[in-house]
Regions:
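N-terminal amphipathic alpha-helix/helix-capping segment at the start of soluble metabolic enzymes
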Residues: 1-18, 129-137
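Hydrophobic faces of well-ordered beta-strands that scaffold small-molecule active sites
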Residues: 17-19, 40-42, 68-70, 91-93, ...
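Short, acidic/polar
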Residues: 21-33, 74-82, 150-159
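Glycine-rich, proline-tolerant flexible connector loops at the mouths of alpha/beta enzymes
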Residues: 28, 33-56, 172-187
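Acidic (Asp/Glu)-rich catalytic clusters
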Residues: 32-34, 55-63, 82-85, 159-161
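A short alpha/beta connector and helix-capping loop motif
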Residues: 50-76, 80-81, 104-106
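Conserved anion-binding
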Residues: 78, 88-162, 173-176
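Single conserved hydrophobic/aromatic residue that forms the stacking wall/gate
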Residues: 201-211
Length: 211
């Protein structure tokens, strides 16, 4: 199976340079893919992109060394599995607030016995290779978004979820959750980020923080 360059960079303790795609355009995706990013995330939550747009965008990204990722619009297994089948190599999942939700997300990305992903990777076999099923559980990047008050209260249990590769702070929703307007420079925002960093330090396995 084609290696996930983004996961390899993380395992080597380095930063992944990730771009963001919110416009449903193959030309936009193709142009961005030529700019030297490590990965590009197709935003299916707050972007204007749906599945029919996302699949051809991943096709043009796949003509380069850039890793195609997607932010889905919810922790919904059917959508997660469908975009993975289309050749997506990593999922950013919004609104993960506790261990149960984190496990639901991770297991939707994994084939049995470690998850419940249904097999039918259509374009995933073309992009990933004929041995896709043997390695997909390990190669797919799984990132949970921390952006609710409940998530702040359950940081350690979320971050210690087996198979979760990292977290992604949703700063706007997190600000709203703690009673602030969206932003980065308020005291309460800084306090929340500090809590997240402390939890990262306390868990046994390295987890990458993005925002």
């Amino acid at each position: 199976m084609r290696k996930n360059k983004a996961k390899e960079i993380i395992k080597n303790g380095k930063a992944v340079i990730n771009g963001w795609l919110q416009i449903p355009s193959t030309v936009s995706a193709e142009t961005m893919a030529q700019q030297g990013w490590d990965s590009l995330t197709i935003d299916m939550q707050h972007g204007l992109v749906d599945y029919t747009n996302a699949m051809p965008m991943m096709q043009v990204i796949s003509a380069t060394e850039v890793v195609p990722l997607a932010r889905v619009n919810w922790n919904e297994p059917g959508q997660i599995m469908k975009i993975l089948d289309a050749g997506c190599y990593g999922i950013i999942c919004p609104m993960v607030s506790n261990r149960k939700e984190a496990e639901r997300f991770v297991q939707a990305c994994k084939y049995p016995p470690h998850g419940y992903r249904s097999f039918g990777p259509m374009r995933g076999l073309i992009y990933g290779g004929p041995d896709y099923v043997d390695h997909a559980n390990d190669e797919i990047l799984k990132m949970a978004m921390i952006e609710t008050k409940e998530a702040l209260e359950n940081l350690d249990e979320i971050m210690s979820t087996p198979g979760l590769d990292g977290i992604y702070i949703g700063p706007a929703d997190l600000s709203l959750a703690i009673g602030e307007k969206p932003g980065f420079d308020k005291d309460e925002d800084t306090k929340a980020y500090s809590e997240i960093l402390l939890s990262l330090i306390h868990i046994s396995e390295p987890t990458r923080l993005d925002h």
